[in-house]
Amino acid sequence: MMETQLYIGIMSGTSMDGADAVLIRMDGGKWLGAEGHAFTPYPGRLRRQLLDLQDTGADELHRSRILSQELSRLYAQTAAELLCSQNLAPSDITALGCHGQTVRHAPEHGYSIQLADLPLLAERTRIFTVGDFRSRDLAAGGQGAPLVPAFHEALFRDNRETRAVLNIGGIANISVLPPDAPAFGFDTGPGNMLMDAWTQAHWQLPYDKNGAKAAQGNILPQLLDRLLAHPYFAQPHPKSTGRELFALNWLETYLDGGENRYDVLRTLSRFTAQTVCDAVSHAAADARQMYICGGGIRNPVLMADLAECFGTRVSLHSTADLNLDPQWVEAAAFAWLAACWINRIPGSPHKATGASKPCILGAGYYY
């Protein structure tokens, strides 16, 4: 009997808080489970430099290459810590899948930029490395995002009912998993991104831990209505978005300057929840169960807002109820995509991205 294979996935999302690495076990293209996790936070200087690259400026090409190398060294460190925690050697790993750090996402121009020096990462880890997952989907006419619905379908689909899977990172995205049709999904809009940016600007904290500051505020109905009127939310799917559309300077155009900072933060929580609810109600009206993953699940104010918006129509759960830690899901998805690459299995959720066909995503690098 052929032995099972181990893969590592590394993910750093639009929240730009650090890198997650997850170890998974596969039997060819069959998922067997996730076995370990490591996390390395971004140093403050690195995070600031990455955020600076979101805006056009001088010497972007040089800065992007230097940051790609720094990120890849940090990714390699995270992978090494994961291997050490599991008493494994690089030779035990079939492949490593690395998403990289998104700094520009422009599907309307046919590109999405994730920083990672993949040959350097392969050299540092001494593991065959797969990356640049979004480019193949974009080349086939897709949005290049979200890429996780195919993974969600492989793990979480139920043949009796429609399920929704919600990932709340910097951007929130949903996967809709019908029992008898292909999975699809899209970005619903901001997840934690605006809340984090507001918290950083007004309290000099990386994020609102446990929603403690939002809990002290009140929802501003007029502000909420103005935010919800953004045309993105009326666009049909497939669609994807990012900081290019929903940055702090966008929010500030709706403020008169006299708002209480706690009230604005509280309103942003409801804004995320309402856009998710509207998206699910429109695209998956028959879904009665929604499984949540990503950093947003740790914010009790946001979770309460989601529960209030959905009411009794949809039951909310953690992906832990389906045997995958909500903090591990995205990194595990890129380990799974690396396994798809190795086994020549199309991993693209083309019904979610709008690509013309299923594609084998990524490019491989030997060490």
Curated annotation (Swiss-Prot):
**What EC class does the entry list?**
transferase
Reactions catalysed, as given in the entry? 1,6-anhydro-N-acetyl-beta-muramate + ATP + H2O = N-acetyl-D-muramate 6-phosphate + ADP + H(+)
Among Pfam families, the record links this protein to:
AnmK (PF03702)
The EC code for this enzyme is 2.7.1.170
Care to name a GO molecular-function term for this sequence?
A: phosphotransferase activity, alcohol group as acceptor
Q: Binding of ATP: at which residues?
A: G13, T14, S15, M16, D17, G18, A19, D20
| Single GO biological process annotation from the record | amino sugar metabolic process
User: Which CDD domains does this entry report, sorted A to Z?
Assistant: ASKHA_NBD_ANMK (cd24050)
Q: What does this protein do?
A: Catalyzes the specific phosphorylation of 1,6-anhydro-N-acetylmuramic acid (anhMurNAc) with the simultaneous cleavage of the 1,6-anhydro ring, generating MurNAc-6-P. Is required for the utilization of anhMurNAc either imported from the medium or derived from its own cell wall murein, and thus plays a role in cell wall recycling.
PANTHER family attached to this UniProt entry: ANHYDRO-N-ACETYLMURAMIC ACID KINASE
Name of the protein this chain belongs to: Anhydro-N-acetylmuramic acid kinase
- Organism (species): Neisseria meningitidis serogroup B (strain ATCC BAA-335 / MC58)
